[in-house]
């Protein structure tokens, strides 16, 4: 890797959150054109963080040569809307991320960790494979998980919708189906904290109904009209919130 990762983590993410791991992994999947994404959270018990394993899999384009080169050159963004540093948060919470990406007649395997050398050549396969990329997060690097909500599917669902609403709503308006599944597997439940094996999913039907307004300004050179989508959400104890 072309940057010292441990120092970069402290520089770019002084106050990270475990939810950023989900956000970054899902962002990568959506950027790769995935229509089906699964976030599988496996932990023996909430108070046994060393057993935590998270697997994020999708049916997107995967680690093609272009995508892998961008990943290897850590600070090279996809475009002006991406900073190119998000995946650093992976190593703030996990010591290693095992990556397997297959598509057509190729497969690429590598382990993303501190000191990653950027070497992951394509393996040519005999038979054609369906597109699938899986990131397996192992070696939880913290003493504890801060909140049950960091692992509970029903708590993560609204956060994911809020974070990716513009992208998901655009897909919905274009008639493109998608499904994002969040699954928790644990052998030691906590009924008081509503912590137990559970699965939920995000589909177009889960998105709020957006209102469209068109802003027109003939003085603009390239674009005279801009479409803006918004919705107003009631927030308990706080009135309404414009999103």
Spell out what each predicted region is.
Residues 1-34, 38, 42-43, 65-72:
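Bergerat-fold GHKL ATPase/HATPase_c domain
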Residues 35-39, 52, 97:
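Conserved beta-strand core positions
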Residues 43-54:
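Short beta-strand-loop-beta element adjacent to the nucleotide/active-site pocket used for signaling
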Residues 58:
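Acidic ATP/Mg2+-coordinating residue in the GHKL
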Residues 61-62:
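Glycine-rich G1-box
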Residues 77-194:
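GHKL-type ATPase core
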Residues 176-243:
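GHKL/Bergerat-fold ATPase module in large chromosome/replication-associated machines
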């Amino acid at each position: 890797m072309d940057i010292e990762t441990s120092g970069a983590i402290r520089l770019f993410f002084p106050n990270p959150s475990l939810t950023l791991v989900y956000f970054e992994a899902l962002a990568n999947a959506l950027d790769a054109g995935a229509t089906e994404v699964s976030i599988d959270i496996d932990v023996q018990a909430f108070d046994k963080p060393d057993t935590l394993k998270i697997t994020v899999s999708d049916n997107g384009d995967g680690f093609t040569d272009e995508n892998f080169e961008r990943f290897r050159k850590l600070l090279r963004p996809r475009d002006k809307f991406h900073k190119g540093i998000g995946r650093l948060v992976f190593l703030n919470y996990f010591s290693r991320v095992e990556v397997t990406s297959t598509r057509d007649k190729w497969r690429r395997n590598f382990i993303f960790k501190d000191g990653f050398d950027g070497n992951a050549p394509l393996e040519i396969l005999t038979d054609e494979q369906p597109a699938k990329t899986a990131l397996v997060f192992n070696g939880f690097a913290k003493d504890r998980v801060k909140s049950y909500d960091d692992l509970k599917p029903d708590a993560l669902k609204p956060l994911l919708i809020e974070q990716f609403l513009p992208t998901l709503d655009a897909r919905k308006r274009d008639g493109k189906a998608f499904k994002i599944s969040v699954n928790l597997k644990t052998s030691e439940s906590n009924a008081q904290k509503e912590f137990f094996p559970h699965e939920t999913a995000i589909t177009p039907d889960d998105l709020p109904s957006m209102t469209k307004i068109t802003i027109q300004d003939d003085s603009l050179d390239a674009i005279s009209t801009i479409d803006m989508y918004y919705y107003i959400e009631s927030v308990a104890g706080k009135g309404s919130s414009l999103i």
